[in-house]
Amino acid sequence: MQNKQNLIWIDLEMTGLDPDTDVIIEMATIITDSELNTLAEGPVIAVHQSDETLAKMDEWNTRQHGGSGLTQRVRESTISMAEAEAQTLEFIKLWVPERSSPICGNSICQDRRFLYRHMPTLENWFHYRNLDVSTLKELAARWSPELKFKKGSTHLALDDIRESIAELRFYREHFIKP
């Protein structure tokens, strides 16, 4: 099953944007082949956080994660940050050798900052390169502004990854010239 051409897609939901003061509350992973065909979906994990930690979320995060049901899932979860890291790493080891896949997603540098701070063993599994779909989004907005990819906005980790993969397929078809 392991293949160094496979890609690891990851998305995190956090209590905010600062990895020094905010924490991960949900994570999900998907493995695709190099042609962006989904091979496997990993665990979708709500990471337990205390009510005190959740109370520190700003208005946007409180509204978004409360409305999606994520805040309640986080409260009810018994999975620690370390357990979430271990479960995710166990899954990706089945599919991708160490340091062969870039970390893939949308605005993935932000997720990588949180992994570096809170899940360093998992972060170290990735190649040092990033496959960031938002780079193509920014280029298309400037060079081909007529191209628009319509995104949803659930801000749930697995939905966000599926959307990122679909968005990259869209840019491959409509923006990247062979």
Curated annotation (Swiss-Prot):
Residues 7-168 form the Exonuclease domain. SMART domains: EXOIII. GO terms for molecular function: 3'-5'-RNA exonuclease activity; nucleic acid binding. GO terms for cellular component: cytoplasm. Signal peptide: none annotated. Its main location: cytoplasm. Its EC number is 3.1.15.-. Disulfide bonds: none annotated. It is found in: Cytoplasm. Keywords: Cytoplasm, Exonuclease, Hydrolase, Nuclease. NCBIfam families: PRK05359.1. HAMAP family: Oligoribonuclease. 3'-to-5' exoribonuclease specific for small oligoribonucleotides. This is Oligoribonuclease.
